[in-house]
């Protein structure tokens, strides 16, 4: 995995945790909705004492919840700070490993890989999915999320590559940063890699809509409006590509 694809601030535990406490209701909702969906799927597809692999620990929000729910967690990351943050949790084993290579940690009942694939070099994307497949027992489940290539959030973030735009955004919003997303995939591209890795799709969902002016300056009414637009465009085949997160429940069949 490419450590350069992770900005310094994004490698900070507190930065990651603050995403779920953002005072802006739209930004907070984008992250919290994804967190809640992942936890719901992880809980529904595992039971007490199951072995759970988490690739990309971040601030430990999933690690903590799953360990508290009686799962035995193998926490894998390339960032030692993220692993140190969860090392003291009961029933959690930490591993400083590159998940684009075989993990060799035995079979797991469930794996979680949330908002990681976009940080992986494009030529290693398939290798990460192959590695996750190899870490699951036959019949095991992978809960996977990653941004959509043409999501409105990502289109706005690409403008931050231009320093004048980034400076203006920081002046208007108080903070702004490049996302470090180097492997953005369309649903078709991702589902091709999913199939090649040997997974079948048990469930899929897309969510999270962002328009800068409404999100940043319209407060709670703006957040409600954007949620309404999200619900309206979710069924539309092309337009739903503007939604931020593509989320999957995948099964290893063999």
Language model segments and positions:
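Conserved class I S-adenosyl-L-methionine
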Residues: 143-167
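Conserved N-terminal segment of class I S-adenosyl-L-methionine
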Residues: 1-114, 123-129, 184, 205-209, ...
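A short glycine-rich, Lys/Arg-flanked "PGG" loop and its adjoining helix->strand segment in the class I
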Residues: 126-141
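Short, flexible, basic/aromatic active-site loop/helix in glycosyltransferases
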Residues: 165-176, 230
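Acceptor-substrate binding/catalytic loop of class I
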Residues: 173-189
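Short, hinge-like loop/turn segments at secondary-structure boundaries
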Residues: 91-93, 159-163, 219-223
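A C-terminal cap/extension of S-adenosyl-L-methionine-dependent methyltransferases
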Residues: 188-192, 202-254
